[in-house]
C-alpha cells in the first residue's frame, strides 16, 4: 500500500494486516489511555484505493485535535471484488479494533466509525451490521457525504461533472 500524506512528528504511523486486510494505524506519539478509537474508511467511489486518495486529512485531524487512534483499512475495491467484499473488510477491521483496543491504545467502549464518500457509505453499512450482529458497540458514526445509492434522480442524470457524475456513480 502506498500512502500519501505528509509525515507529522507528533503522530505515530504503523502499517498492519488484519487477516487479508492491510490497514494504517495513526495515533499521537503520546497517546492518552482514554483515547477514542476511530475506524476511518477512505473514499474513492469503491474503485480507487488509499494511495490515490487525499481522504486521510479528516482522519489526521481527529488524531491531532482529539488524540484519537485511527485505524483505516485498505479494503478490497469493487472492480476486483464486488459487494460485499469491501463491507466485510471494514467490518473485520471493526471487530479487530474491539478485540485489540488496549494494544492499539484506545478504549473499546469509545469506537467511532466514519468515512467520506464511498467510505461514508461503508461507515453507515458497517454500523448497521454492527447493530444487527451485536458483537461490537459503535459509540458514534460520522458518514460524510456518503455514497449510499447508485440510483439517479432526474436532475442527477444530467450531471457530467469532473469529480463525480452519473457514469462514475454507476461504475462504483
Question: What are the residue ranges of the model-derived segments?
Answer:
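Alpha-helical membrane-targeting segments
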Residues: 1-3
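Alpha/beta-hydrolase superfamily serine-hydrolase fold, recognizing
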Residues: 5-172
